[in-house]
From Swiss-Prot:
Keywords: Cytoplasm, Hydrolase, Nucleus. It comes from Schizosaccharomyces pombe (strain 972 / ATCC 24843) (Fission yeast). GO terms for biological process: diadenosine triphosphate catabolic process. Belongs to the carbon-nitrogen hydrolase superfamily. NIT1/NIT2 family. This is Probable hydrolase nit2. GO terms for cellular component: cytosol; nucleus.
């Protein structure tokens, strides 16, 4: 078994403050013996509005954020999965990206951009149009090799599409990560149900680092970072209401993945519906 660390954050509009928190959590995770740490969506910042998001994405502090996290991965000898905003080739558009950083040289070995964007209007809740600022990703990437096993990348709203989880499992994933920033309303109704469902669909561990708490006067996130095993059991959940930033841990056992897949083989009828 191998120890995984999952971070919960309450990111603000200050990239450097968020960076300091991330570096401290990397240090804490490594000190506990974790081999890999996972951070939520928008670890670098959560902006007040679209204009600020574009401005911050192109600010030099964003480059420093990634550079310093890479250095921390090397310093503490730990794999890091972190989500950031990145400039795109289209003016006034950004990419919502999940980066895997290896600890030997601090190299980025995988860069996934969110495929499904969050464009919703919630009655008595927020209206969010991610497509106003963000380009959707155009690829599902092969799972990344880590000390925990092969980890497939998805981000937040991707969780509502079981086809992506099944695709990642078919590409060899033992684990799927869903770094997220769910709204309080959708989180309370759907968060745990979706995480457990994707674990059952794919027969993978599901790792779900989350943003939690009030970010600014317009935005708050649900929190409740979780780790779910391939049987659909929640084996760790962030519940420290006294601290908006912190860690949860769990030992991941790939033998359990094999056991679940052997015990309940999912023999698909691809003569009746398309192969994913």
């Amino acid at each position: 078994m191998t120890l995984a660390a999952v971070a919960q954050l309450n990111s603000s509009g200050s990239i450097l403050k968020n960076l300091a928190i991330c570096k401290e959590l990397i240090s804490q995770a490594a000190a506990k013996g974790a081999k890999c740490i996972f951070f939520p969506e928008a670890s670098d910042f959560i902006a007040h509005n679209s204009d600020e998001a574009i401005e911050l994405t192109n600010h030099p502090d964003c480059s420093k954020f990634i550079r310093d996290v890479r250095e921390s991965a090397t310093k503490h000898s730990i794999f890091v999965n972190i989500c950031v905003h990145e400039p795109s080739k289209v003016k006034n558009k950004l990419l919502n990206s999940s980066l895997f950083i290896e600890p030997l040289h601090g190299e980025i070995i995988s860069r996934y951009s969110k495929a499904h964007l969050f464009d919703v209007e919630i009655k008595n809740g927020p209206t969010l149009k991610e497509s106003n600022t963000t380009l959707r990703g155009e690829a599902i990437l092969p799972p990344c090799k880590t000390p925990l096993g092969k980890v497939g990348s998805a981000i937040c709203f991707d969780i509502r599409f079981p086809e992506q989880a099944i695709k990642l499992r078919n590409m060899g994933a033992h684990i799927i990560t869903y770094p997220s920033a769910f709204t309080e309303k959708t989180g309370a109704a759907h968060w745990e149900v979706l995480l457990r469902a994707r674990a059952l669909d794919s027969q993978c561990y599901v790792i779900a680092p989350a943003q939690g708490g009030k970010h600014n006067e317009k935005r708050a996130s649900y929190g409740h970072s979780m780790i779910v095993d391939p049987w659909g059991t929640v084996i760790a959940q962030y519940s420290d209401i006294s601290s908006p930033n912190g860690l949860i841990f769990a030992d991941l056992d790939l033998n359990l993945v094999d056991h679940v897949r052997t015990y309940i083989p999912l023999l698909r009828r691809n003569d009746l519906y398309p192969t994913i």
